[in-house]
Swiss-Prot record:
GO terms for biological process: glycerophospholipid biosynthetic process. The lineage of its organism: Bacteria, Bacillati, Bacillota, Bacilli, Bacillales. InterPro entries: GGGP/HepGP_synthase_I, GGGP/HepGP_synthase_sf, GGGP_HepGP_synthase. This is Heptaprenylglyceryl phosphate synthase. Its cofactor is Mg(2+). It comes from Listeria monocytogenes serovar 1/2a (strain ATCC BAA-679 / EGD-e). Pfam families: PcrB. Prenyltransferase that catalyzes in vivo the transfer of the heptaprenyl moiety of heptaprenyl pyrophosphate (HepPP; 35 carbon atoms) to the C3 hydroxyl of sn-glycerol-1-phosphate (G1P), producing heptaprenylglyceryl phosphate (HepGP). This reaction is an ether-bond-formation step in the biosynthesis of archaea-type G1P-based membrane lipids found in Bacillales. To a much lesser extent, is also able to use geranylgeranyl diphosphate (GGPP; C20) as the prenyl donor. The gene is pcrB. Mg(2+) binds at D8, T34. Sn-glycerol 1-phosphate binds at K6, Y153, V154, E155, Y156, S157, G158, G183, G203, N204.
């Protein structure tokens, strides 16, 4: 997967726009949000996407994101916080409540480093965002070699990040996949981050300028003869 669209169930997205996203050339979708997430909205958005054969990931930020019928679940582990609630606390409570019913083969954990101090998710998780390049590289190595996480996700959350930081963090990984999300608003930015990231995540621009969002995916569309 080179490109994923991230959709917020708390935001309105017309059915026609969803259809365009499905046929854009993207490799799949993440459904996820920070606040005001209602199970009905998650269900409705998921149902709009099920016509596609592309993977649909539910990113579980709270219990409202859990749909038993989903094929893929992403579990965020925020690495750059000192509040254990976001590294394992909430996770343990959910497992305590639902452990025997969790479809573990459909669950993938992702190590998050959140770098936009003004983002809602940074405030919510008490993320320490004033990190050096060396800090971020260290988190990448921690994710891969200590926690053995399959995904390391650098999240600038609405702000376009530093390609050099992305390059350095990506170069530190061998087996863990590197995902980048944040502020991609053009096909040029998509191509720039895709040089280093295994997967780029495109979100906010969907709700600001759909055509520009579609362009970020078309550059990855498989060419046919």
């Amino acid at each position: 997967m080179k490109h994923l669209f991230k959709l917020d169930p708390a935001k309105n997205l017309p059915t026609n726009d969803v259809t365009k996203l499905i046929h854009s050339g993207t490799d799949g979708f993440i459904i996820g949000g920070t606040d005001n997430v209602q199970i009905e909205a998650v269900q409705n958005l998921y149902e709009l996407l099920v016509e596609t054969d592309l993977p649909i990931f539910l990113e579980i930020s709270n219990e409202s994101m859990i749909l038993p019928e989903a094929d893929h679940f992403l579990i965020p582990v925020v690495l750059n916080t000192e509040n254990s609630k976001w590294t394992h606390g909430l996770h343990k409570e959910l497992i305590k409540e639902m452990g025997e019913f969790i479809p573990w083969k459909r669950v993938t954990s992702e190590g998050y480093v959140i770098l936009n101090k003004d983002a809602k998710v940074a405030h919510l998780t008490e993320a320490k965002t004033d990190l050096t390049d060396e800090d971020i590289v260290a988190y990448a190595r921690l994710a891969e070699n200590i926690f053995h996480l399959p995904i390391f996700y650098v999240e600038y959350s609405g702000m376009y990040g530093d390609p050099e930081v992305v390059r350095k963090a990506s170069a530190a990984l061998s087996n863990t996949k590197f995902w980048y999300g944040g502020g991609i608003r053009s096909k040029e930015q998509a191509a720039e981050m895709a040089k280093y990231a295994d997967t780029i995540i495109v979100g906010n621009i969907i709700y600001e300028d759909l055509e520009k969002a579609l362009e970020t995916a078309t550059i990855f569309r498989k060419k046919t003869v």
